[in-house]
Amino acid sequence: MMLHIPGVLTKEQVAQCRDILDAADWADGNATSGAQSALAKRNRQLPEGSPAARAIGDAIQDALARNALFFSAALPLKVFPPLFNRYAGGDAFGTHVDNAIRLLRGTDFRVRSDLSATLFLEEPDAYDGGELCVEDTYGVHRAKLPAGDMVLYPASSLHHVTPVTRGERVASFFWIQSMVRDDADRTLLFQLDTQIQQLTAEKGGRDASVIALTGIYHNLLRRWADA
């Protein structure tokens, strides 16, 4: 499942993030690449653990903690500290799959990458190219979203970023370890939760069908979740 999550950051928050990012020192994006990714990747990246990355990453994680749609879809157990990249002048990232395990350098913190997230920090009309293209059995799905919006997709997916031929594409990217490892199970829970919320809005939280379906949701979560 590929999901668009609008308004993770407000426009004011995006502007504040960009002020910090535009003043920061950027490095070769291959500093965090695995062997396969290094063959396909050409971009710039904010060094892991830099003061700018930590400050903006904390703001993003605070915003995610308040985002009900993100929680419902991801059921997050761990979130890898957000990283940041920029593409310009023909930069691109060829087709690849993300590493299964992400280790935070200098620590014992590690995340199983069940989900990948890209949070856009530049408006789509400010650059040409730079589309995130995610492949699945139904074809290729493209994302080039407004600044502050995020796309969430299975980390097991083949994906690439098309060349940026005008302007620059700036984004945050990170990985989530979900309480529910299996993508199909997680998607089913998300669909069920969405319907429960809609039914609650129509009939109220005391309706018998709402109570019954909520019980089913939690029993499925209890069966599938690692916490």
From Swiss-Prot:
Binding site for Fe cation: 96, 98, 159
Co-factor(s): Fe(2+); L-ascorbate
UniProt binding sites for 2-oxoglutarate: 169
Coiled coil stretches, renumbered: none
Gene Ontology MF: a single term: iron ion binding
GO terms under biological process: DNA damage response; intracellular iron ion homeostasis
Keyword Iron: yes
EC category: oxidoreductase
The keyword Membrane appears for this protein: no
Keywords carried by this UniProt record: Dioxygenase, Iron, Metal-binding, Oxidoreductase, Vitamin C
Domain of life: Bacteria
Entry EC no(s): 1.14.11.-
Record-linked HAMAP family: Hydroxyl_YbiX (MF_00657)
Family annotation (NCBIfam families): PRK05467.1-2, PRK05467.1-3, PRK05467.1-4
Entry protein name: PKHD-type hydroxylase BTH_II1201
Organism listed in the record: Burkholderia thailandensis (strain ATCC 700388 / DSM 13276 / CCUG 48851 / CIP 106301 / E264)
Lineage: Bacteria, Pseudomonadati, Pseudomonadota, Betaproteobacteria, Burkholderiales
